[in-house]
Amino acid sequence: MKILALERELPGSTGDRFQPLLKDEARRVWELQQSGTLREIYFHAEEHTAILMLECAHAEEARHLLSTLPLVQAGLIDFVLIPLAPYDGFARLIEGLTDGEQNVS
């Protein structure tokens, strides 16, 4: 299952508390990426918070993996998790084809 994880900084988080942990954070993110569970990572262009795409069996697994990040362990950040399902809207197009509609290409 794909899980979208949106970082949020927790109250009281200041830049000086982040700095000593950033190298270890990058190392752990790289490990998660190498393991195949972290598929993509981006920064929000306006807020400089992380947006991650994870591949996990369920949201609880994603929450557990994210809890291994040094910034999470230090209580500086947390994540909002959004489980994703495949888009099935294209089925509406195929329904018409099965009702005798011709495929015109």
Label for each model-derived stretch:
Residues 1-105:
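Conserved, structured core segments of small domains
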